Design a protein with these regions (language model features):
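Flavin-dependent oxidoreductase catalytic cores
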Residues: 2-440
């Protein structure tokens, strides 16, 4: 949590802005504290959004590199950090090097990570299951709501099989165990990842969920897994442990999860009493967050990719709302907060290149991030370049170095593919699940 006391932070909200003269920090909407329904107080309206790190050790446990990375971000001025997606099932990873939370052995390492991530801000762990978006080096046959074609990205994925009802129910238990493990380790809460085409988003989409049982068919049935996880996590961890959900505004695929679907799921999440909702969009086959969801020039100029949908969300809920994607300037952040379109600004890539950007923004030292899209030809290669190049920057911070904007994106791609292939195959060959699957 912040070094400033809760009373001092909340008093800062109530102080009147000075008349005339230079703008002070207290004039900024992004500098105002935010208290969530769980009671968690965020020191300001800037959040480090989840980015996949791939920095866990061979067991899938966090270690010194993740501790260094998150302590740097925690001291960089944000009110909240959200970790990259920690896996609830070690058989199925989003990438090699994911943190895995599936047995009690991880507790000490998880506690050390929590202590580092909370030095100056609040910290949530993002919990996820990749489903069909598990690459073929890690798993020869990934899981999905229904059998279907593999993810169509660079021949990196295998054809998934449909989950059995028992596997679906066990997934609820895995999320509950992981959430409670994070609570016991000292984290302030968790974020359930139901966006970007991972398993919970696959259940929400009629394109990937064609089940004929209680887990498929109607939107209510397709949302059942997400809602059961939310209820079970809340029952296990209690009202004082922050429970957030990340959801797509849409998956931007014809016949897929639509904005109207998303608004209905938001209503249900509101009824469940979650503490924070984050809006994003897309999946591996339609990566809106990385490449933009067919963005109009006005959207790019406004910076926030999903702001129009956020306004629609405001019409159905007053849940604290975080929007991630495209924010670069203080002016755009202030405008979005000023019109009450959101409560929390999510920042990802700017913090990989400049971990102190929030503090410099709040102090007035800078007005915007200098992060620019990488210029690499081809949609798939461009997506890979973005992931690998910014991953290289996080690697440097984790090693105690400063980011290096001069790194070649093509070199990053080569390193990423070599490393992911080798480590993915090693994980596949050596991973052994816990003898007893932990239950929530």
């Amino acid at each position: 949590m912040s070094d400033m006391s809760a009373n001092e932070q909340e008093e800062g909200v109530m102080e009147a802005s000075p008349q005339g003269g230079e703008r002070t920090t207290k004039d900024l909407g992004i500098a105002r504290p935010l208290r969530l329904n769980s009671g968690l107080l965020l020191g300001n309206r800037l959040a480090k959004a989840a980015m996949t790190e791939g920095l866990a050790d061979r067991r899938g446990w966090p270690g010194p590199r993740l501790e260094r990375l998150y302590e740097r971000w925690a001291r960089g001025g944000v009110g909240l950090v959200i970790t990259g997606n920690a896996m609830v099932d070690g058989r199925y990873l989003e990438r090699a090097g994911n943190v895995i939370i599936e047995d009690a052995g991880v507790h000490e390492a998880l506690s050390a990570w929590s202590a580092a991530a909370r030095k100056g801000c609040a910290a949530l762990v993002q919990l996820s299951h990749p489903g069909r978006q598990t690459n073929r080096f890690i798993c020869g046959q990934p899981l999905a709501p229904s059998e279907g074609p593999p993810v169509k990205v660079m021949a990196s994925f295998s054809r998934p099989r449909a989950m059995t009802p028992l596997e679906v129910e066990a997934t609820v238990e895995r999320f509950v165990f992981a959430a409670d493990a994070c609570r016991r380790a000292g984290f302030d809460g968790v974020q359930i990842h139901a966006a970007h085409g991972y398993l919970l988003a696959q259940f929400l989409s009629p394109l990937t969920n064609r089940r004929a049982d209680v887990w498929g068919g109607s939107l209510e049935n397709r949302a059942r897994l997400l809602l059961e996880i939310v209820r079970a996590v809340r029952a296990r961890t209690g009202a004082g442990f922050t429970l957030a959900v990340k959801i797509n505004s849409a998956d931007f695929q014809k016949g897929g999860f639509s904005e109207e679907d998303s608004l209905e799921v938001v209503r249900w999440l509101d009824a469940e009493g979650i503490d924070l909702l984050e809006i994003s969009g897309g999946n591996y086959e339609s990566p809106a967050l990385l490449l933009g969801p067919g963005l109009r020039e006005s959207t790019v100029a406004r910076e926030a990719y999903f702001l129009e949908f956020a306004r629609r969300v405001r019409g159905v809920t007053r849940l604290p709302l975080m929007v991630t994607g495209g924010f670069r300037s203080a002016a755009a952040m202030e405008a979005a907060l000023g019109e009450d379109a959101l409560d929390l600004v999510g920042l990802a890539r700017p913090l990989a290149l400049d971990p102190d950007f929030p503090a410099r923004l709040l102090s007035g030292e800078v007005e915007r991030s200098e992060v620019q899209p990488l210029r690499v030809k081809g949609k798939a290669l461009g997506m890979l370049a973005e992931a690998s190049w910014f991953g290289d920057q996080m690697d440097r911070i984790a090693d105690g170095l400063d980011p290096d904007p001069g790194i070649s994106p093509y070199g990053s791609i080569a390193r990423y593919l070599t490393w992911q292939t080798a480590r993915g195959l090693r994980h596949r060959a050596t991973y052994r699940p816990p003898q007893t699957v932990q239950r929530g």
